[in-house]
């Protein structure tokens, strides 16, 4: 008979057990986290302070930046601490808390990306009614719906995982506390947990992905057949390409991790995918959305001072 116990704490194995590599990983992830804070923080400040960015598109972009900062902050600070500390234990309550916020913020981002695609669809395909359809009340309602749906989705996973019985090893083969590696340590029946993880997570992520895909294809088709302006077509294609790149970087690793069959699961692959959607994608989002965006670059010049840019241009 299995020794069923109530776990008071878990032990993270982390990214690697090789001591010599840990300072290297610490430096890499510290740089990634700082770039994330600076990049997304700058966008958030610009959206709040610059009146010309007070539009639905930038309202959602500000939400995305806030999410990216919070999403990475759920996992990366703990990872950095674990890379420099010998003790990597966390209480069971701390484990469930991290799990909850990771899924809460991650699923909010998945839904928000679909909302952003819908916003671009309305702006390009129905520009005359854009301000009527995407009025401030609708924008707030859509954003609030994304946050609320995701909160209860994450709460479902947290409650169901908290009610599992754990036995044997306390060692978690991951660098943060997620549902899948925790289910491997459970000695009670996890069939319902696994089913919900695949079906519900799949419905949220793949549903949002296909809505985004549909919006992008409809926009491209609309412009090709209804619009003869090369300038407008180029601008719209650039916007769709940027958003589609972000979508693929986020949904691809999420789908690979949570939707594929349990028999095909590899913890090494899961860790690589988790690094992609929890650390790398939040860093790339500001670059993808703002590098070719003239409005954002102009707002950046206004906020951080024209003189700084003039001095930089003179020296280069």
Swiss-Prot record:
Q: Which SUPFAM superfamilies match?
A: Family A G protein-coupled receptor-like
Give the GO molecular function terms: G protein-coupled receptor activity; odorant binding; olfactory receptor activity
Q: Does the keyword Transmembrane helix apply?
A: yes
Kindly report every residue range on the membrane side named Extracellular: 1-23, 74-97, 159-195, 258-270
Q: Which domain of life is it from?
A: Eukaryota
Q: How does it sit in the membrane?
A: Multi-pass membrane protein
Question: What Pfam families does this protein map onto?
Answer: 7tm_4
GO BP annotations listed: detection of chemical stimulus involved in sensory perception of smell
Disulfide bonds, paired cysteine numbers: 95-187
Q: Which residues lie on this side of the membrane: Cytoplasmic?
A: 45-52, 119-137, 216-236, 292-316
Keyword Cell membrane in annotation: yes
Which keywords does this Swiss-Prot/TrEMBL entry list? Cell membrane, Disulfide bond, G-protein coupled receptor, Glycoprotein, Membrane, Olfaction, Receptor, Sensory transduction, Transducer, Transmembrane, Transmembrane helix
Q: What does this protein do?
A: Odorant receptor.
UniProt name for this protein: Olfactory receptor 12D3
Query: Which organism was this protein described from?
Result: Homo sapiens
Write the lineage as a comma-separated list: Eukaryota, Metazoa, Chordata, Craniata, Vertebrata
